[in-house]
UniProtKB/Swiss-Prot annotation:
Keyword terms of this UniProt record: Cell inner membrane, Cell membrane, Ion channel, Ion transport, Membrane, Transmembrane, Transmembrane helix, Transport
TM segment ranges: 10-30, 76-96
Principal localisation: membrane
Record carries keyword Ion transport: yes
Name assigned to this protein: Large-conductance mechanosensitive channel
């Protein structure tokens, strides 16, 4: 079997195609969440704590010297990325919770199977023994 044919069979399996679609949707969803955090959530949060823009939070480790740029640790951007992550994680959690709930509804409990001949016979024997014990 040629490598191209093997790859084609691998790529056309349902799982791989589903995974590719999931990655594409996830990337688009990530952009939406990043915009939500940067443009919708962080500005009012910054206003609530005194008009602060989180992107501006930074610590300069070394000042610029001539042509060498300053070494800066931008922890405000990190805080914003943490918000991004938390929102994405919560959205994924809720989606999985919804999917699990829908799957549980699909899996209706199966009706109890009809008793086998042996079970019916044993039940009759039990009932007869109870009857005999009650007479005694």
């Amino acid at each position: 079997m040629s490598i191209i044919k093997e790859f084609r069979e691998f790529a056309m399996r349902g799982n791989v195609v589903d995974l590719a679609v999931g990655v594409i949707i996830g990337a688009a969803f990530g952009k939406i969440v990043s915009s939500l955090v940067a443009d919708i959530i962080m500005p009012p949060l910054g206003l609530l704590i005194g008009g602060i823009d989180f992107k501006q939070f930074a610590v300069t480790l070394r000042e610029a010297q001539g042509d060498i740029p300053a070494v800066v640790m931008h922890y405000g951007v990190f805080i914003q990325n943490v918000f991004d992550f938390l929102i994405v994680a919560f959205a994924i959690f809720m989606a999985i919770k919804l999917i699990n709930k829908l799957n549980r509804k699909k899996e209706e409990p199966a009706a109890a199977p009809a008793p086998t001949k042996e079970e019916v016979l044993l039940t009759e024997i039990r009932d007869l023994l109870k009857e005999q014990n009650n007479r005694s």
